[in-house]
Regions:
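PLP-dependent amino-acid enzyme catalytic core
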Residues: 1-230
């Protein structure tokens, strides 16, 4: 909602008639974005989601709203949806015609505000006297959430470490072990919101620590779980 209101404000300030928001989802993001932007003047949202790979509840949360929310089912996986969104943004003619932006974490206006609740969580734990050596465990798919926490850490948030929790789409977990980043087609799991085979925020994490694998592993450890474990 913060991003929706912020975008609406700048649309009014710049005198634009309408901005079109593209968002790829593996489940949770589509629901959150659709409800956050529902009815916001000057914005139309297009939610791209993989056919048969989101839960019925999640699907109903962004396909039944109408108004300024349009859902587009894609015959593929989340990574295909994300690739379509990225292709749209590098098409200059399409951008000029449709005035595109994104509500995925490829847009810094999406993930930077997420850093706020890491500070809030730390403040609450400090009040309870439990903030020493605080470790944050973050379920991770496209890695926007944990990247926001790492940005907060760079801003001075005194969190000791982060744990990136993956399902069997464990590309980042394997990177932590080997130092090699090898994207793969995503596999469908019970934790479908984390079914990402090429997390777009890996590049931000990599750049944040200047590609230093030792430094990355000193702040982030990984965990991976099968459907049976979940």
């Amino acid at each position: 909602r913060f991003m929706a209101r912020l975008l609406s404000y700048f649309i009014r300030q710049e005198g634009k008639e309408q901005v079109n928001v593209l968002v790829a989802t593996s489940g949770d993001t589509g629901s959150a974005v659709a409800n956050g932007f529902l009815g916001v003047d000057g914005i139309h949202v297009y939610v791209l989601y993989p056919k048969g790979k989101v839960s019925k509840i999640q699907e109903s949360q962004f396909t039944t709203l109408g108004k300024n929310i349009t859902a587009i089912e894609v015959d593929g996986v989340f990574d295909d949806c994300q690739a379509l969104v990225k292709c749209a943004f590098i098409d200059e003619e399409l951008n000029n015609h449709m005035k595109l932006t994104s509500a995925n974490s490829i847009n810094v206006a999406r993930f930077l505000p997420q850093a706020f609740y890491y500070f809030n969580a730390y403040a609450r734990m400090e009040k309870l006297g439990l903030a020493d050596n605080l470790v944050m465990c973050v379920p991770s798919g496209n890695f926007g959430n944990i990247t926001a926490g790492l940005f907060g850490h760079k801003m001075g948030l005194p969190i000791k470490r982060f744990i990136a929790a993956n399902n069997v789409n464990d590309i980042f977990y394997k990177y932590l072990q080997s130092g090699k980043y090898e994207p793969k087609p995503s596999k469908q799991t019970l934790a479908n919101a984390m079914d990402v085979g090429d997390p777009s925020n890996f590049a931000r994490i990599y750049d944040l620590y200047c590609g230093d694998h030792d430094k990355i592993t000193s702040y982030i450890s990984g965990a991976t779980y099968t459907d049976n474990q979940i």
